[in-house]
A protein has these predicted regions:
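Long, low-complexity, charged/polar intrinsically disordered regions in eukaryotic proteins
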Residues: 1-9
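Amphipathic alpha-helical dimerization/coiled-coil segments
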Residues: 92-131
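Canonical helix-turn-helix DNA-binding module
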Residues: 44-72
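Chalcogenol-based redox active-site neighborhoods
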Residues: 120-280
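Short glycine/proline-centered loop/turn elements that form peptide/ligand docking sites
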Residues: 19, 36, 53-56, 60, ...
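N-terminal helix-turn-helix DNA-binding core of bacterial DNA-binding proteins
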Residues: 12-53
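Basic, amphipathic "hinge/linker" alpha-helix immediately C-terminal to the N-terminal HTH DNA-binding motif
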Residues: 22, 73-96
């Protein structure tokens, strides 16, 4: 494999980034490590590339400081690969590629906080059922309750929300969960909201609307890239499309809701999903 790193005196950041991440296989390896597939055999199965090529890419990503190799078995010797701070810094690149592919290559280029029911995004989200949410560096949306309802939303009152299909409704959605929080608790479920807004913005929103459950910031796009969640761009920010997951205490996604055309109706649907899962 030929790697072409930019000259140390080249002032172009893109050139330097391409030298580390420009190889397509390296990007897919980074995608899958971000998604919790940290062991060699897992990466072979997910990427479909040969073991020799995978070993080369992993060695290069470790050498460039994107991944760290950690031993998890002495006999036989086995290693897993985890993101370094540099690797986590590349997550917005993955999110941008995902959004570009969804919006411009698989879509018509129009920003949308929802999705067509027959879209690739819907297929990807529904495919999360049975998948475990990996441990993340900056946030953890999974609680110790039997179930956690994780609802992702674009962000309250973001610029241009009224011009984007599905953009309006974040405050109503959060307040509906607030008003029905006791019903979820009675079913052994907690509620967590996630957006890519900064923690300070979320704290102000929670205080103004008396939100009594966690609102978590995925500003660094860890959860977004781990689960390959659909996003769109608005107000100069990558924003999560409106989507909901029911997760069990083992971190496994048990049910999903996407797209969400009715924010208050989705809260009722989430209650129904928890109720059905509780009955086994």
């Amino acid at each position: 494999m030929t790697r072409r790193h930019a000259s140390a005196v080249d002032p172009c950041g893109i050139a330097h980034a391409v030298g580390v991440l420009g190889d397509p296989w390296s990007l897919l390896v980074l995608r899958d490590v971000a998604g919790g597939r940290t062991r060699f055999d897992q990466l072979v199965a997910e990427t479909g590339i040969s073991r020799k090529v995978l070993a080369q890419r992993l060695d290069a990503l470790v050498s460039d400081g994107v991944l760290e190799r950690r031993a998890y078995s002495d006999r036989p010797p086995r290693h897993e690969y985890v993101l370094t701070a540099l690797g986590r810094g590349a997550l917005p690149v993955l999110a941008a590629l995902q959004e570009f592919g969804d919006t411009w290559l698989l879509g018509d280029g129009s920003p949308d906080a929802g999705a067509a029911t027959d879209s690739n995004e819907v297929t990807r989200v529904s495919g999360l059922v049975g998948q475990a949410i990996p441990r993340l560096h900056a946030l953890d949306p999974v609680t110790d309750e039997p179930f956690t309802v994780v609802y992702c939303y674009p962000g309250n009152a973001f610029p241009g929300a009224d011009e984007i299909p599905g953009g309006i409704g974040c405050t109503l959605e959060s307040c509906t969960y607030r008003d029905r929080l006791g019903e979820f608790a009675d079913l052994g479920a907690s509620v967590v909201g996630v957006s890519t807004q900064r923690p300070g913005e979320q704290a102000a929103f929670a205080a103004a609307n008396r939100i009594r459950f966690p609102l978590l910031s995925d500003a660094d796009l860890e959860l977004t890239t781990a689960l390959r969640l659909p996003t769109f761009r608005a107000g100069g920010t990558t924003r999560l499309k409106r989507q909901t997951f029911v997760v069990d205490r083992d971190r496994v996604v048990r049910a999903t809701l996407f797209p969400i055309p009715d924010v208050t109706g989705s809260v009722e649907e989430a209650l129904g999903l928890v109720r059905a899962l509780g009955r086994g």
